[in-house]
Amino acid sequence: MIDFTGKTSLITGASGGIGSAIARLLHKLGSKVIISGSNEKKLKLLGNTLKDNYIIEVCNLANKEECNNLISKISNLDILVCNAGITSDTLAIRMKDQDFDKVIDINLKANFILNREAIKKMIQKRYGRIINISSIVGIAGNPGQANYCASKAGLIGMTKSLSYEVATRGITVNAVAPGFIKSDMTDKLNEKQREAIVQKIPLGTYGIPEDVAYAVAFLASNHASYITGQTLHVNGGMLMV
């Protein structure tokens, strides 16, 4: 049984489907949750479902000062889940420098800052769990998403490097790479598009946000204390590595 009673977790991108599912599960398992994102209205709606033992922290990850301040506000941090990310899709020949930079800045650089600042706190207590949410496309690539794929591949490389650096300090650093997870975005696909994607998934269905949340909870738990520097793929068999 996973029990996070007495632990404090920070979840970024908590206003989205996957982020909110992670926050709800960690909260259900006993953790105090700090839910962060840029959409205060959605964060408040999530908070209403949690009822207690939570804190809302509105943060714009494009602002590096806000990234640093987000961690500094937390006196005791046990679990960090870096889930926030953006897309700005177009073919590489049409992609402007700023389209590439803004995705890298939020999906990779901001998450590096959060990891770095969290590690500083976790080293003091010689305990910590960091989970970075990557993507199937960080391994497989995807046309029209050179910026997004680069950012998600970078997260995996960063996760491995950091796991080496802090392994002797009681801190584990892992990644979760979701495949196609049911969301508002997938709901907008037409039936033909949905069927084409499902045909590529051996389990024959989209995942749900809770599938990712349970993977995160496992990696954050003591059951995964001997696992670090790894990427847990949650994709229904769409990519087997």
From Swiss-Prot:
Q: Which Pfam families match?
A: adh_short_C2 (PF13561)
Binding positions (NADP(+)): 13-16, 38, 57-58, 83, 148-152, 181
SUPFAM superfamilies (alphabetical): NAD(P)-binding Rossmann-fold domains
- GO-annotated biological processes: fatty acid elongation
Can you state which reaction this protein catalyses? a (3R)-hydroxyacyl-[ACP] + NADP(+) = a 3-oxoacyl-[ACP] + NADPH + H(+)
Per the UniProt entry, the Enzyme Commission number(s) are 1.1.1.100
User: What GO MF annotations does this protein's record show?
Assistant: 3-oxoacyl-[acyl-carrier-protein] reductase (NADPH) activity; NAD binding; NADP binding
- Lineage top rank: taxon: Bacteria
Keywords for this protein: Fatty acid biosynthesis, Fatty acid metabolism, Lipid biosynthesis, Lipid metabolism, NADP, Oxidoreductase
- Annotated active site residues, numbered on this chain, are 148 (proton acceptor)
Tell me its family.
Answer: Belongs to the short-chain dehydrogenases/reductases (SDR) family.
Q: Tell me, how does this one assemble?
A: Homotetramer.
Report the function annotation for this chain: Catalyzes the NADPH-dependent reduction of beta-ketoacyl-ACP substrates to beta-hydroxyacyl-ACP products, the first reductive step in the elongation cycle of fatty acid biosynthesis.
According to UniProt, the name of this protein is 3-oxoacyl-[acyl-carrier-protein] reductase FabG
Q: Which organism is it from?
A: Rickettsia typhi (strain ATCC VR-144 / Wilmington)
Q: What is the lineage of its organism?
A: Bacteria, Pseudomonadati, Pseudomonadota, Alphaproteobacteria, Rickettsiales
